[in-house]
Curated annotation (Swiss-Prot):
Protein name: Follistatin-related protein 5
One Gene Ontology term, aspect cellular component: extracellular region
Domain EF-hand: 175-210, 211-246
Intrachain disulfide bonds: C89-C119, C93-C112, C101-C133, C270-C321, C362-C413
UniProt entry keywords in alphabetical sequence: Calcium, Disulfide bond, Glycoprotein, Immunoglobulin domain, Metal-binding, Repeat, Secreted, Signal
Binding site residues for Ca(2+) 1: D188, D190, N192, E199
Residues covered by the Kazal-like domain: 83-135
């Protein structure tokens, strides 16, 4: 090759001497030494040979290109019009990649392209010896740049397969890192740990990448990813360019436990670190939180922290964080919410004669479970414990046998946990009842007075029953008139020989009023507890069947069917329910402008530590969805779709420990029942199935026990929910009782524990289960219940009613009797006969 160039060089000098200068058409102001410049720039061979041939061959036709030299970037063409030889800009240059910058600031793939551009632009363009133009211009768009990098990875992958005869092992991220490491090693020709522009040029030549990179070149790597602008690419910058993100999470921080007190704010920080760490994504119950518009979780911060503005017990649970796109490296945060103790004592005061037994009980709720202690007149009673003075049920009860005058005092129960302290006083007076003293004024035999009574609504009116001695305190007859009105409690219906009452649902409103539905009279009666009289009738839509008292907003919700066939059900609300004012109903906002689809509704009940509920749900007939409602505005908020789980909701229960809703589903057309579906109250998202647990869910007042009744399988399943919202495996109880209703009662032997009582829809027994141990017992011989067809208002044809936080009695009706159970002794206390269809029972009182 060098010999050929030498011949041309010599000939160039010879003919310049003999022929003189080239014509002016040869280029823009070309000098006599232009051939030397041309040869140094390696002018395209066809153009060079044409010029040499034109000088050497003297006898060719004057107008042909044989004798015409056009200069760099141009070539000779014969005009179709004149037939004369003319110079024109070259159509294309031979493919050859040696990039240069032109004085016009543009990037050119080789010298020929510079001269061709000078011809086309009719301007002088020289070579500029720097690389600034390599990084200018916008031909290489972001999308094209990404495509180029993907293509480079594909090429490297193919190389690896050819060299190793196998695919790279590991996950996508590990494989990508391996390929980028190998690519960098190949690019870094001098192995100095840096890739410069010359090495990129060398790769372009070796791999012939000049025209195949989507309007991009390898130089764009320096333009976009030279992080420190030193015109070199280090391995870390290569990682950045190809998004090989190396994340780190210390082993001891993979699991983080955070506790906050209810009502405060909380910040969960993600410990995942790494250069170019992508944005942090947070999940709860596998639902991404970043994309949700949540009131209480609405700021993720520049550092990716999760910020909870006002902590509640619904926020309890596990949160995971990871860098976007790198979910395999994640940190788990166990978030626990502590709640200060709330105490109730019973009784607040009592008087006892010397020689009898006195009991002072304390119930405390909080998270974690509070520790209990007692003071007498400000002094710890622990050193004074004896056979006569004992602590029972894990310290929740002070038991004094054979009381003496010196036992008189103020007994203070103190509850403590990590979040705070609470206390309350129970006063004991010991003296002769015949003496007219303060103690005599405060005298209150347990079970006497207007409180601590069962109210039973049956065919012959309303009976008020004291459970200890099973005594009637009051009988409100059907013919009794409403206080101040002429209306009767149960007017005689046409065709009836005997004046009878028909009742459905009833609710206790702050131990002040009882609201009770009369479905055949299209109204709700209000019973005043103080006077034990019916004081008002509130008209409703036809056939009111279900009432619920929303204590948070002091309103009673009323579900009416419209007809006995449930053809036009509606929801109404009675506001200011505990007020001494005339009451009336207002309609809720229809969901989808349709009232006639309402099948049921659910509003969680408040507890000692959870005193406010904001939301409820409406269930539509045969619809696999929940309609969320705002209890304050009584308006629709959103729909939670359950179609993916093929669940038409039939029953709901709620625990504040994590804010979970448990949904019992209706059987399908074949009678099969799908497992319960769980919904997260924080995100309103479906979490999934509650394992394989089926049936009607019930949750204990403290939120810790979920009891599910599957009547088809005769199965009772008990699950425990921890203070961290973890749902533990169930234990099973098989029974053929066909459970109708369930009641929870605080344990008399263990603090912070509950027992359940289940009534039977077909049999004469009641099921007892000690939830902490799984101990089971039957209380027998309670007579047959009402037949299901005799109680059309709901599925609970045999109700069972507890007697409050400290009460030891429960009541359950049979077809024509009432049975009072003693929960402390786990036995039947008494039977009250001649009470027909008394399946609406309410407890009023402290205990």
């Amino acid at each position: 090759m060098f010999k050929c160039w030498s011949v041309v060089l010599v000939l160039g000098f010879i003919f310049l001497e003999s022929e003189g200068r080239p014509t002016k058409e040869g280029g823009y102001g070309l000098k006599s030494y232009q051939p030397l410049m041309r040869l140094r720039h390696k002018q395209e061979k066809n153009q060079e040979s044409s010029r040499v041939k034109g000088f050497m061959i003297q006898d060719g036709p004057f107008g042909s290109c044989e004798n015409k030299y056009c200069g760099l970037g141009r070539h000779c063409v014969t005009s179709r019009e004149t037939g004369q030889a003319e110079c024109a800009c070259m159509d294309l240059c031979k493919r050859h990649y040696k990039p240069v910058c032109g004085s016009d600031g543009e990037f050119y793939e080789n010298h020929c392209e510079v001269h061709r551009a000078a011809c086309l632009k009719k301007q002088k363009i020289t070579i500029v010896h720097n690389e600034d133009c390599f990084f200018k211009g916008d031909k290489c768009k972001t999308t094209e740049y990404s495509k180029m990098k993907n293509m480079l990875l594909d090429l490297q992958n193919q190389k690896y397969i050819m060299q190793e005869n196998e695919n790279p092992n590991g996950d996508d991220i590990s494989r990508k890192k391996l390929l980028v490491d190998q690519m960098f090693k190949y690019f870094d020709a001098d192995s100095n740990g840096l890739v410069d522009i010359n090495e990129l040029t060398q790769v372009i030549k070796q791999e012939e990448l000049g025209k195949d990179l989507f309007d991009c070149t390898l130089y764009v790597l320096l333009k976009y990813d030279d992080f420190n602008a030193d015109k070199h690419l280090a391995l870390e910058e290569f990682y950045r360019a190809f998004q090989v993100i190396q994340l780190s999470l210390p082993e001891d921080q993979k699991l983080s436990i955070t506790a906050a007190t209810v009502g405060q704010s909380a910040v969960l920080s993600c410990a995942i670190q790494g250069t170019l760490r992508p944005p942090i994504i947070w999940k709860r119950n596998n639902i991404i939180l970043n994309n949700l518009d949540l009131e209480d979780i609405n700021d993720f911060g520049d550092d990716g922290s999760l910020y909870i503005t006002k902590v509640t017990t619904t926020h309890v649970g596990n949160y995971t964080c990871y860098a976007d796109g790198y979910e395999q490296v994640y940190q788990t945060h166990i978030f626990q919410v502590n709640v200060p103790p709330v105490i109730r004592v019973y009784p607040e005061s009592q008087a006892r004669e010397p020689g009898v037994t006195a009991s002072l009980r304390c119930h405390a709720e909080g998270i974690p479970k509070p520790q209990l202690g007692w003071l007498k007149n400000g002094i710890d009673i622990t050193p004074k414990l004896s056979k006569q003075l004992t602590l029972q049920a894990n310290g929740s009860e002070v038991h004094i046998s054979n009381v003496r005058y010196e036992d008189t005092g103020a007994y203070t129960c103190i509850a403590k946990n990590e979040a705070g302290v609470d206390e309350d006083i129970s006063s004991l007076f010991v003296e002769d009842s015949a003496r007219k003293t303060l103690a005599n004024i405060l005298w209150r035999e347990e079970g006497l007075g207007i409180g601590n009574m069962f109210y039973v609504f049956y065919e012959d009116g309303i009976k008020v029953i004291q459970p200890i001695e099973c005594e009637f305190q009051r009988h409100i007859k059907p013919s009794e008139k409403l206080l101040g009105f002429q209306d009767e409690v149960c007017p005689k219906a046409e065709g009836d020989e005997v004046q009878r009452c028909v009742w459905a649902s009833a609710v206790n409103v702050k131990d002040k009023f009882i609201y009770v539905a009369q479905p055949t009279l299209d109204r709700v009666l209000i019973v005043d507890v103080q006077s034990q009289k019916v004081v008002q009738a509130v008209s409703t839509d036809p056939v009111p069947v279900k009432l619920h008292y929303d204590k948070s907003h002091d309103q009673v919700w009323v579900l009416s069917w419209g007809t006995l066939e449930k053809t036009s059900p509606t929801l109404q609300v009675i506001t200011l329910a505990s007020g001494n004012v005339p009451h009336h109903t207002i309609h809720t906002q229809p969901v989808g402008k349709q009232f006639d689809r309402v099948d049921d509704f659910f509003i969680p009940t408040t507890t000692l530590i959870i005193t406010h509920m904001r939301f409820g749900f409406i269930l539509h007939k045969d619809e696999a969805a929940l309609q969320k409602i705002d209890l304050e505005t009584m308006s629709y908020i959103k729909t939670i779709n359950l179609k993916d789980y093929k669940c038409v909701p039939q029953s709901l229960a709620y625990t504040h420990l994590g804010g979970y809703y448990f949904i019992g589903c209706k059987p399908d057309s074949t009678g099969a029942v799908s497992p319960q579906v769980m919904v997260d109250g924080v995100t309103d998202s479906v979490i999934g199935f509650n394992s394989d647990v089926t049936g009607t869910p019930y949750v204990s007042p403290d939120g810790h026990y979920l009891v599910s009744i599957n009547d088809v399988k005769g199965l009772v399943r008990v699950q425990y929910i921890t203070i961290r919202g973890e749902i533990q495996e169930a234990f099973d109880i098989y029974t053929n009782l066909h459970i109708s209703d369930l009641a929870f009662q605080p344990s008399f032997t263990e603090a912070h524990q509950y027992n359940i009582y289940g009534s039977s829809s077909t049999q004469t027994d009641v099921l007892f289960v000690e939830l902490s141990s799984g101990k089971v017992k039957m209380i027998k011989s309670l007579k047959e219940p009402l037949k299901a067809e005799e109680w059309p208002w709901n599925r609970k044809n045999r109700q069972i009613q507890d007697s409050g936080l400290f009460g030891q009695y429960l009541m359950t009706p049979s077809k024509d009797s009432l049975f009072i159970l003693d929960g402390r002794l786990n036995k039947l206390n008494c039977e009250i006969t001649e009470v027909e269809k008394g399946n609406t029972v309410i407890w009023v009182g402290d205990a």
